[in-house]
């Protein structure tokens, strides 16, 4: 018989930097889960990633105080800012442009995000990434 699920916890944690302090500790502690066990497992799985890159994670908590977690790809906005070489988007995205990325960079981001996007094909995924970039004040060359 399957374990009884008592809840899901959604967090964004920097790769390789999970520790018992907020937001991880309180979120897991409320469900009675072993915080250090999660931190060690998460840090081990994010070892190959760029340190500090925010990674969305969905933790499934079970009634017997065990858990499983699924990591998603980093947010598109973080990848776009990294590709454009900017620290933050434009406060007026439709008038003030803060950077630019090429279509090739947008394709690379779309491939990295492909599992989490609902796009039918790569071209649709690239257009989704381009739309996110435009809403941040970053132009996409070649589209």
UniProtKB/Swiss-Prot annotation:
Pfam families, sorted: Ribosomal_L11, Ribosomal_L11_N
Keywords on record: Methylation, Ribonucleoprotein, Ribosomal protein, RNA-binding, rRNA-binding
One Gene Ontology MF term: large ribosomal subunit rRNA binding
Transmembrane regions: none
The keyword rRNA-binding belongs to this UniProt entry's keyword annotation: yes
Highest taxon of source: Bacteria
UniProt xrefs under Gene3D superfamilies: Ribosomal protein L11, C-terminal domain, Ribosomal protein L11/L12, N-terminal domain
PTM info: One or more lysine residues are methylated.
Classification via SUPFAM superfamilies: Ribosomal L11/L12e N-terminal domain, Ribosomal protein L11, C-terminal domain
One of the protein's GO biological processes: translation
InterPro entries according to UniProt: Ribosomal_uL11 (IPR000911), Ribosomal_uL11_bac-typ (IPR006519), Ribosomal_uL11_C (IPR020783), Ribosomal_uL11_C_sf (IPR036769), Ribosomal_uL11_CS (IPR020785), Ribosomal_uL11_N (IPR020784), Ribosomal_uL11_N_sf (IPR036796)
GO cellular component: cytosolic large ribosomal subunit
Annotated function: Forms part of the ribosomal stalk which helps the ribosome interact with GTP-bound translation factors.
Oligomer and partners: Part of the ribosomal stalk of the 50S ribosomal subunit. Interacts with L10 and the large rRNA to form the base of the stalk. L10 forms an elongated spine to which L12 dimers bind in a sequential fashion forming a multimeric L10(L12)X complex.
Protein family membership: Belongs to the universal ribosomal protein uL11 family.
PANTHER family listed in its UniProt record: 60S RIBOSOMAL PROTEIN L12, LARGE RIBOSOMAL SUBUNIT PROTEIN UL11M
Name by which UniProt lists this protein: Large ribosomal subunit protein uL11
Species name: Cupriavidus pinatubonensis (strain JMP 134 / LMG 1197) (Cupriavidus necator (strain JMP 134))
Taxonomy of the source species: Bacteria, Pseudomonadati, Pseudomonadota, Betaproteobacteria, Burkholderiales
